[in-house]
Amino acid sequence: METQALPGGRRMTASDTNIPVRLAPANRNRSYMQMCWVVPDLDAAIRHWLDSTGAGPFFVFEDVHFTESHYRGTPMDVAPHRAAIGQHGDMQIELICPVGDHPGIWRDVVPGGGFGFHHVGLYCDDYEAERAAYLSTGAQMAFEGLMMGARTCYIDTVPTLGFMTELITRNPVADMVFGQFRTAAEGWDGRDPVRTLG
């Protein structure tokens, strides 16, 4: 991504605060609600987050699938993985542990066996508008499908932001599940740190 040139050919720096920037339209969602890391060992990663940050409790998902899904234009389910999500304040912390070294969105960002930041998540009132806005910038669709009965996608914003951006359609099932994460974290006393949904 090119930096804006100033008079005399000088490149814009952080100190050039008087130069207006192009903001996203006012109706765009600007509040990230999730951060995700790809990890080589899910159980160890959960323990590190519990011990180091107090996030949690974490809810573990062992067999995650999408329907009507495409990976970079080819019909394909999401690459096999285990996952865990815990609440940390207003932010969901998601941990993804790929199973095997299958091609897909996890390995696109974090090569086999590695550890690293993967994506931020946005919960969208107007999924189609958010999707179109990201794609209009030249970003590519990495993966899209149905999860919990609602459209979800991963936009490849790695070239410009260094990570992917997940868009999730706001829907009653996700409201219930996300509410369970938040409720479990409120006043949590440390008991039952690793759970399953139910």
Model-derived features: where do they sit?
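Short, charge-patterned binding micro-sites
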Residues: 65-70
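A short, aromatic/hydrophobic, helix- or strand-capping loop or linear motif
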Residues: 60-64, 144-148
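Glyoxalase I/VOC metalloenzyme domain signal
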Residues: 2-33, 37-59, 74-140, 156-198
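Short acidic/glycine-enriched loop/turn segments that link adjacent beta-strands
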Residues: 31, 148-151
